[in-house]
Amino acid sequence: MIHIIILHITLSRPTAKIGAINLKKYDSTKIKNIAIAGQAGSGKTSLTEALLYKSGATDRLGKITDGNTVSDYTPDEIKRKCSVYTSLSSLETGEFKVNLLDTPGMFDYEGEAVEGIAASGCVLITVSGKSGVRVGTHKAYDLAKEMGKPTMFVVTKLDDDNANFNNVLTQLKAEFGPTVCPVVVPVIADRKIVSYVNLIEMKAYKYEDGKAVETDMPTAEVSEKMGYRIDGLIEAVSEAVAETDEALFEKFFSGEAFTQKELTDGIHSGMNSGIITPVTCVSSTDLSGVDMLLKEIDLLLPPPSEKDAMIGETADGEAVEVACVESDPMSAFVFKTVADPFVGKMSYIKVFSGKLIPNKEVVNATTGSTEKVGKLVTLQGKKQIDVAEAGCGDIVVAMKMNVNTNDTICDSTRVVKFAPMTFPKPCYKMAVRAKKQGDESKISAAMTRLMEEDLTIDYKLDPSTNEMILSTLGGLHLDSVVGRLAGTFGVEVETSVPKISYRETIRKKVKVQGRHKKQSGGHGQYGDVWIEFEPCVSDDLVFEEKVFGGAVPKNFFPAVEKGLQESVKKGVLAGFPVVGLKAILVDGSYHPVDSSEMAFKMAASIAYKEGMRQAEPVLLEPIGSLSVFVPDDNTGDMMGELNKRRGRVLGMNPAEKKGMTEIVAEVPMAEMADFTLLLRQMTQGQGVFTFEKARYEPLPANLVADVIAKNAVAD
């Protein structure tokens, strides 16, 4: 048994005056930037609310059900009762200013989570004590690790009768490996939390009137009923700390006990290096355990000053290290944008070095332009508080500044650019049209603003169908964008499944005549052409002339070609553009008075229609290349689904991510309208895919009649 020397640390926190935190200047060693991420519904916003209230940063404990939380304040969030956007708030614990970035857990809003985690120095991943580890838990953890962020699991909702901390802890260890290290655990009797054990202090605390009071440690009998031995967990903490430092390793195996400072410093170091992921627990409703979490934030989580130097790129493309040093030239990164039509653009900025000062000119290293820094504010949810400057390591919002998400701004004495964040690509596509005629320009202007704000949406014209296509990450994301258009920009739109850009072509060579003759007094109209039509591999019309003896004067050749170019925009089957068509003008006749360019254009159009009918026209459908990643357990289901969608599976490969398989296939685009939603449902959000148009193939005969009926055009 390892004996640990216990140094008592009081649990009471200095209470900050409401808003006082925003008036102080914080050194980079005294700032902590924390993203709160995890599965939707796992308690992220409630935890944010509890931390703010318990620290004294707010004077009331908001509730999601009441729509009065600090971080979920937009109409969309209040209506949905979940986070849609990453919000910024701050508190003070000990000597530290803590910036909290409450991120959405819904997969449709993953872009917001990317921004929040990118700006953070550490990620608290909430795990419901009732639901346990879910797909969103893995997504948050994977995002954090991809960006090199230390992580801590916070088990929430332990006041629920169906919560089971032991099951969750077992899941965490199984899913995330030996780095998982509990530091605070609940003592549960009759499905109720009676106290919490701080494994670092080796003390138990119960809560009376919201205050922690030291109580007896649980007996061995109680520990066994809970499913975990307290003494075993305490020893596991020491074992984890021993792995962080050679001197600690030697001390551990010599049988010496660690001091409490050695334990906290060791966990702190282990978090920085990624070999320790602490697990703690709270109840955000009665606030039990929240004061312990505040202390863990104080003692365990790293400030920006401890982070390795950022690697940037100079104007010459050379790598440069940028350390978090306030005396160095300023450099900062725009990680989020809010497009507010009333207050203007709000740019969320993380300062990496130096100081960001209002009204000072800086270089936008991404665009090369010079910009003036706008007014700086910090946020407490929607509340804005002016700040005089922002030191390195801090997060602020610049008002009305001409910069965009992923831009780097810096001092002209050291121009440096940081790598942009990588966002998931929007794959859920819907056609959008204005409800009111004449609002099209308003939609375009509003979407331009929204695309500045959200890099996971796209809005552009599909020239093949002449529809405006809005691409998002899913149905909820689409609803949010449509809601913003109406609520924020006053433009109502309708959405529909995008049209499929079918094409038409021919299968055999024919020779036809096109003759246009009209006499109505005075000059008439006369144009006569013989044209050979044959299949070819070009997407565009291929036009040639092989006229001998001047049967058609050369000056009318362009008119014939123009008539054909206009005609191939609509096929004879269902009005789709024609591809793979070669036209050779071989003969014809003309009238010295009545022939004109217009007459020969008409003659070419007549020849085209007759030639298409005789040349066995067929419909072509677009085929896309699909690369879809699914959990190994879903491989069979996905193969069956692709077969239902007329897909051709080309191969399967083990993915880089353990437990995932890549399936490569070709699938008709007409079968992919709901694939985003199907994949999310099948894989509980774990699946991802890319899909790009590859080529056209003949539409199966059994589907032709239906497509023609829906798209038939008048002769």
Feature locations, PLM:
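Structural and coupling elements of P-loop NTPases
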Residues: 3-10, 15-715
